[in-house]
């Protein structure tokens, strides 16, 4: 009986994968980092600034609890799997 209980505990821990948190790419370093508890979405924001014709769009990557609201002249996309917001 003890063996069965121990087996169930081990299987539960493996299935839950305790300690594994949700991660997204974040700027400014564009590296994968764990998100805060409750932040289960990754987002990508992009927009043109005064230097857009020289260096391209400004990119912001990060985690969010909800998808950031739409903003004029900003492209915003959200996704819900680990590291799904790769640099465009």
Curated annotation (Swiss-Prot):
Endpoints of the signal sequence: 1-21
Disulfide-bond pairs as recorded: 24-42, 35-63, 48-52, 67-78, 79-84
Entry keyword annotation includes Signal: yes
A GO term, aspect molecular function: acetylcholine receptor inhibitor activity
PROSITE patterns hit by this protein: SNAKE_TOXIN (PS00272)
Principal subcellular localisation of the protein: secreted
Tissue-specific expression: Expressed by the venom gland.
Keywords on record: Acetylcholine receptor inhibiting toxin, Disulfide bond, Ion channel impairing toxin, Neurotoxin, Postsynaptic neurotoxin, Secreted, Signal, Toxin
A GO CC term attached to the entry: extracellular region
Subcellular location: Secreted
Family to which this protein belongs: Belongs to the three-finger toxin family. Long-chain subfamily. Type II alpha-neurotoxin sub-subfamily.
Record function comment: Binds with high affinity to muscular (alpha-1/CHRNA1) and neuronal (alpha-7/CHRNA7) nicotinic acetylcholine receptor (nAChR) and inhibits acetylcholine from binding to the receptor, thereby impairing neuromuscular and neuronal transmission.
The protein's name in its UniProt record: Long neurotoxin 31
Organism: Drysdalia coronoides (White-lipped snake)
């Amino acid at each position: 009986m003890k063996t069965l209980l121990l087996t169930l505990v081990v299987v539960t821990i493996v299935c839950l994968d305790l300690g594994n948190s949700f991660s997204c790419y974040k700027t400014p370093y564009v590296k994968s980092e764990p998100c805060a508890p409750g932040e289960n979405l990754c987002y990508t924001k992009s927009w043109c600034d005064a230097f857009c014709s020289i260096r391209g769009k400004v990119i912001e990557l990060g985690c969010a609890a909800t998808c950031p609201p739409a903003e004029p002249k900003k492209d915003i996309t959200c996704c819900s799997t680990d590291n799904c917001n790769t640099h465009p």
